[in-house]
């Protein structure tokens, strides 16, 4: 049985992921899923490790005030993904959270395929990110 871990970091990513995963589930009912997701993924019957509110912080000040909680959740998420041992890590949007997790997972378990949906805007912000991302993301899916 194939296993997919779905990693989102905010409600909009949860919604985008649910659209893709809904199609995947209907065409491949034998896939086992686990996620860091929200209401949309839960509505598909997909178990989530914890509520998205535990990692969704908007604004520089809120992130700064919660930086230790965020780091703890990144570590916890990496550990749980490794424990689940998925064939694919499907991360969606929220690059400051999801790409940090994906990078660490890929370093620990290079055989896990990584797919990121909603490419970060590297051409506007942090142009050096492309060189780094290609080391741990196998495929990037774009929104059109």
Which residues does each PLM region occupy?
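Active-site and donor-binding regions of nucleotide-sugar-utilizing enzymes
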Residues: 3-144
């Amino acid at each position: 049985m194939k296993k997919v871990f779905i990693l989102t970091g905010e409600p909009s990513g949860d919604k985008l992921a649910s659209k893709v995963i809904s199609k995947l589930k209907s065409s491949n009912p034998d896939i086992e899923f686990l996620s860091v997701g929200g209401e949309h993924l839960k509505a598909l019957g997909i178990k989530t490790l914890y509520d998205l509110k535990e990692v969704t912080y908007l604004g520089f000040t809120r992130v700064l005030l919660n930086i230790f909680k965020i780091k703890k959740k990144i570590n916890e998420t990496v550990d749980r993904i490794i424990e689940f041992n998925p064939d694919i890590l499907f991360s969606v949007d929220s690059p400051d959270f999801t790409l940090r997790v994906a990078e660490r997972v890929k370093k620990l378990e290079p055989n896990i395929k990584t797919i990121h949906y909603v490419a970060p805007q590297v051409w506007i912000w942090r142009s050096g990110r492309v060189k780094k991302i290609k080391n741990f993301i196998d495929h990037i899916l774009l929104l059109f």
